[in-house]
Design a protein with these regions (language model features):
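Membrane transport/envelope proteins' first extracytoplasmic loop
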Residues: 2-276
Length: 276
């Protein structure tokens, strides 16, 4: 005589449980769907932002680093620095550092007083660059790039924080400029005035672009900053650090031999305005 197969009691119980308390299970289901959707969306958005940032490095010609000299370098010194070779005295043995050839670009600026509400009082510091197509380009977010000596394009983040808009008139060290556009420089993801600053300041510090004629209107001292790009792009942060150390030794030796002085040295990997 064959045994009677015992049915699993859960077959009937589970559907009854769900139907009897469907509101609770609906809430749990919706919670899981929304959570999974939210987390997945964050990952997709993060990947998209990282891709855009990586593309921006090449599209807007981001520097591999920059240094500042006390005096403007002549063409002979520029060529010597670009060679990446360490300058040694005749009686000294050659350095052990590797030759690190680079291309240099002038990236001069002035730190001026900003009066964004034109009330005659200083509201902060504005770092003014000339319009260039060689290195550290700016993305135009609104308006237009400056076209004449009386126009200026300012950082979009700073403008949003202080209520500045396209068409406003601001004063830069007492001289009036019309805001032609809002921009974002590729080397200023955040508004760090100095590499030693622990936190950026998007209210008291601004970066801006003017024409060459507009730059000549200003009076504060020029910072002779040179941005560089390696001829052979480093594969990772470790190689970037090694190249930076070798280039620093070579650059300093050439600058000292020319009777000039290094005021600042900031490779890209240690620049908080880029990597914050």
């Amino acid at each position: 005589m064959s045994r009677k197969k015992i049915k699993n009691p859960l077959i009937k119980r589970i559907p009854k449980e769900i139907i009897g308390d469907w509101k609770k299970y609906l809430v749990v289901f919706l919670f899981l769907v929304l959570t999974i959707g939210f987390v997945s969306g964050m990952y997709v958005a993060n990947d998209s932002m990282l891709t855009s940032a990586d593309e921006g490095v090449s599209k807007y010609k981001q520097e591999d680093g920059h240094f500042e000299l006390k005096d403007k370098a002549d063409s002979e010194l520029v060529t010597a620095i670009e060679s990446g070779e360490v300058k040694t005295a005749p009686d000294e043995k050659d350095s052990d550092s590797s030759k690190t050839p680079v291309t240099l670009y002038e990236n001069f600026y002035r730190n001026e007083d900003e009066d964004y509400d034109a009330d005659g009082k200083k509201d902060g510091t504005i770092r003014v660059y000339t319009k260039t197509g060689d290195i550290n380009l700016a993305c135009l977010i609104e308006g237009s790039f400056p076209q004449n000596e009386n126009e200026i394009a300012v950082d979009r983040m700073h403008a949003d924080n202080v209520g500045m808009k396209v068409g406003d008139t601001i004063k830069v060290s007492g001289k009036e400029f019309k805001v032609s556009g809002l921009i974002a420089y590729v080397n200023y993801s955040t508004l760090h005035e100095k590499k030693t600053d622990m936190m950026f300041d998007a209210i008291k510090f601004d970066v801006a672009m003017v024409t060459k004629e507009g730059f000549d209107r200003l009076d504060k001292s020029i910072h002779y900053t040179y941005a560089w790009k390696y001829e052979d792009e480093p594969a990772d942060d470790i190689e970037q650090k090694e190249k930076s150390d070798d280039f620093l030794e070579a650059m300093v030796s050439q600058v000292m031999a020319a009777g000039n002085e290094v005021e600042d040295y900031t490779p890209r990997y240690s620049n908080p305005a880029i990597n914050f």
